[in-house]
Amino acid sequence: MISLFDMFKVGIGPSSSHTVGPMKAGKQFVDDLVEKGLLDSVTRVAVDVYGSLSLTGKGHHTDIAIIMGLAGNEPATVDIDSIPGFIRDVEERERLLLAQGRHEVDFPRDNGMRFHNGNLPLHENGMQIHAYNGDEVVYSKTYYSIGGGFIVDEEHFGQDAANEVSVPYPFKSATELLAYCNETGYSLSGLAMQNELALHSKKEIDEYFAHVWQTMQACIDRGMNTEGVLPGPLRVPRRASALRRMLVSSDKLSNDPMNVIDWVNMFALAVNEENAAGGRVVTAPTNGACGIVPAVLAYYDHFIESVSPDIYTRYFMAAGAIGALYKMNASISGAEVGCQGEVGVACSMAAAGLAELLGGSPEQVCVAAEIGMEHNLGLTCDPVAGQVQVPCIERNAIASVKAINAARMALRRTSAPRVSLDKVIETMYETGKDMNAKYRETSRGGLAIKVQCD
């Protein structure tokens, strides 16, 4: 059973699959070298990056992430401000300090990081890391970054975790989830909490989700108070700060009944602009879609009631349980199923979480989740210039408003839905697999080839 800790991971931008996952892979590789007693024998390290990781890797900072992982850093704790200087030193000296400075190796500028357009056999986001002693390979590993910051090595691809802990309500589908809720009388968030308590203590759960919400709030605060231009060739100006000033200073806006939409847009823009700048964010379930879940909870906090620990925990439990269904039965990787697996899933999760907070039954929560995905089916992932900026930032704002609408529609529905959550998850996955690779995070089609950099 997937822990909801894994659905909401603190990390750095701009991408969970192309930044967070590769950093974790680099860290895992160097940890293996230490554990196997090989670190001191290594004289050179080289990396091969494939598929979507290669095609959009520069714009997504994949190369930087792998280097920082090999240096011994983790996404949740890496010192973001230190990254540019560290990378500059590696490039200038063509040397890389591994495992928090324990051992230095060659990392040539020309072939230390090699980008390949083709895919490895098991997934669109593949990478290989090699450690050499002279010309001899002393250790090599193939990793796949499968979305949302999850990584798996080649040997364990498609396998269940060997140390998987049993939970009291091991649902694999929305149908099973609802059956457990009906049988026990638990709300959807309550049932998810019972499973989580089999994996973590109550204290660990409380502390973890307090940190998640604090990180989201800090990200919103930074984003709506920071001006300037986002990094990269597109020179995209930040918009959240100007929108915030407009909202707090205009009497005309304050009397507009649609004013709340502007606030929701601002919350989402703030988060995704921080993500695009490589800031500290929370996967929800990915970085490319990290603005939707916090924007909807910030909406609840500002316009319905102040968010308490009980409220944000219920929200994350319901949203996370829905996200886990997509992770188990479909994909949350834009490189595998397009943006419907990122923004679509985040919209579905946020709609479910909000429906839970608004008093929805488990059935209504699942209807909200279904609506949130149904109207994102077929959504392509075509980042312009390989950056997580256009259309990604604005798309998060649109989907945040859509999630609120989905929750409200679900709660006010008086007839039985014709489309189930399980069927929409199945449809999303099949649609993604049928989607031309041009539209799955390769920047080879759609807006990515129509919008030119200046």
Curated annotation (Swiss-Prot):
Q: Which InterPro entries match?
A: ASB_dom_sf, Fe-S_L-Ser, Fe-S_L-Ser_mono, Ser_deHydtase-like_asu, Ser_deHydtase_bsu
Naturally occurring in which organism (per UniProt): Escherichia coli (strain K12)
- State the organism's lineage: Bacteria, Pseudomonadati, Pseudomonadota, Gammaproteobacteria, Enterobacterales
Q: Which cofactor does it need?
A: [4Fe-4S] cluster
Q: What does this protein do?
A: Also deaminates threonine, particularly when it is present in high concentration.
- What is this protein's name? L-serine dehydratase 1
Q: Which GO terms describe its molecular function?
A: 4 iron, 4 sulfur cluster binding; L-serine ammonia-lyase activity; metal ion binding
What does this protein's record comment on cofactor binding?
Binds 1 [4Fe-4S] cluster.
Catalytic reaction equation(s):
L-serine = pyruvate + NH4(+)
Pfam families to which the protein is assigned, alphabetical = SDH_alpha (PF03313), SDH_beta (PF03315)
Q: What induces it?
A: It is made aerobically and anaerobically, in minimal medium.
